[in-house]
Regions:
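Catalytic cysteine-centered active loop of the rhodanese-like fold, especially the PTP/DSP P-loop
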Residues: 96-145
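Short low-complexity, flexible loop/linker segments enriched in glycine and/or proline
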Residues: 99, 149-153
Length: 186
């Protein structure tokens, strides 16, 4: 190989890397671009309580709501339409296997204990490493269960009781596998 070809290859590589780094530095130096990028990502990854209420009210079939809390907490009370995948007691491999069984043509929405619980974010991050993408409800069980009207303006005197059920998961929705304590949790 001639010196000319080696130099041309190095120059091409340098220009490519330079453009890539330059573009990144340009974006990082422009607050409006950072803000736009942040909100685009945020909106792609979250679902509001009002949207969930609308889906339940309209009996929408374009989504699956996944309750990440423990099986016992799910059986005590959970939102209508929710299936239970108790992420806090699963390894990443088990979690991926469970979510891989969910319909690919539906929006998958996860929720955990509260808005301050990071379980939903941990699950979303782990699944994204395996090409599975979910959205997170912007508030958790505690906020919606006890302050439904606060998170659903215009709901009137609705206290959310019409959206809460008890009992075991419908086995036709999503299988629940027994597991040992794993790596996920608040």
């Amino acid at each position: 190989m001639s010196i000319k070809k080696v130099l041309l290859g190095l120059l091409t590589l340098a220009v490519t890397v330079g453009l890539s780094v330059g573009t990144t530095l340009y974006v990082l130096s422009r607050p409006e671009l950072l803000t736009r990028h942040f909100y685009a990502g945020e909106m792609a990854a979250v679902v509001s309580p009002a949207t969930l209420k609308k889906y339940i009210d309209e009996k929408a079939t374009n989504y699956v709501l996944v309750d990440l809390r423990s099986q016992g907490e799910y059986e005590k009370e959970h939102f209508k339409t929710a299936v239970n995948i108790p992420a806090g007691s699963m390894s990443e491999a088990q979690l991926v296997a469970m979510f891989a069984k969910l319909p690919k043509d539906k929006e998958i929405i996860v929720h955990c204990y509260s808005a301050y619980c990071t379980l939903g974010r941990q699950v979303g991050q782990a699944l994204s490493r395996h090409g599975i993408y979910v959205k997170e409800l912007t508030v958790g069980w505690s906020e919606l269960r006890y302050h439904w009207d606060l998170w659903n303006p215009g709901a009137g005197v609705d206290d959310g009781q019409d959206y809460i059920v008890t009992g075991k998961a419908d086995p036709s929705n999503a299988p629940i596998i027994p597991c040992t304590v794993g790596e996920f949790g608040c």
